[in-house]
Amino acid sequence: MPLLDSFKVDHTRMNAPAVRVAKTMRTPKGDNITVFDLRFCIPNKEILSPKGIHTLEHLFAGFMRDHLNSEQIEIIDISPMGCRTGFYMSLIGMPNEQQVANAWSASMQDILNVKNQAEIPELNEYQCGTYTEHSLEDAHNIARNILNRGVGINKNEDLLLDDNLLNS
């Protein structure tokens, strides 16, 4: 099985919160697709709570679109990582890391402005697979933590995993 790009970076050297360009590609029609690693937590040291990450999933995607989508950029998807240390964001376009960091910070402020569970979009049994598994309080704590720490930038060249460590 081929080694995925996300496993070619040294997770022990990742900073968080931080933005990283995980992958870029071009479609057959010539559109640029960029995948960003939005690392909320330091890998293997911190983790997002299940209810908090689920509530973020419902809120973050909409707020990021509000702050980042433009004539040149369109978010395709924002999905939580299985390891619960962040999200992957796929989009059409090539914003720089600082644009993404700014949108992320603005989105965290928007999350803090959500005052009650009833304001969480798609929070019902018809649109959510586990609609009872949410915590606005956890989402607020995560957002506050991101804003207090500030969003940095992780560069792939700084995180390249040594060949000797691959598959070890």
From Swiss-Prot:
Metal-binding as UniProt keyword: yes
- Biological process terms in GO annotation: quorum sensing
Q: What class of enzyme is it?
A: lyase
Give one GO molecular function term. Answer: S-ribosylhomocysteine lyase activity
Report the cofactors.
Fe cation
Please provide the record's keywords in A-Z order: Autoinducer synthesis, Iron, Lyase, Metal-binding, Quorum sensing
Q: Which reaction does it catalyse?
A: S-(5-deoxy-D-ribos-5-yl)-L-homocysteine = (S)-4,5-dihydroxypentane-2,3-dione + L-homocysteine
| Highest taxon of source | Bacteria
Q: What S-S linkages are listed for this chain?
A: none
Q: What is its EC number?
A: 4.4.1.21
How many cofactors are bound and how?
Binds 1 Fe cation per subunit.
InterPro entries, per this entry? LuxS_sf, Metalloenz_LuxS/M16, S-ribosylhomocysteinase
Name the residues that bind Fe cation: H54, H58, C128
Reply yes or no: does the keyword Chloroplast apply: no
The cross-references to Pfam families, in alphabetical order and at most eight, read:
LuxS
Q: Which family does it belong to?
A: Belongs to the LuxS family.
**Any idea what job this protein has?**
Involved in the synthesis of autoinducer 2 (AI-2) which is secreted by bacteria and is used to communicate both the cell density and the metabolic potential of the environment. The regulation of gene expression in response to changes in cell density is called quorum sensing. Catalyzes the transformation of S-ribosylhomocysteine (RHC) to homocysteine (HC) and 4,5-dihydroxy-2,3-pentadione (DPD).
Assembly with partners or alone: Homodimer.
What the entry lists under HAMAP family is as follows: LuxS
- The molecule here is called S-ribosylhomocysteine lyase
Q: Which organism is it from?
A: Histophilus somni (strain 2336)
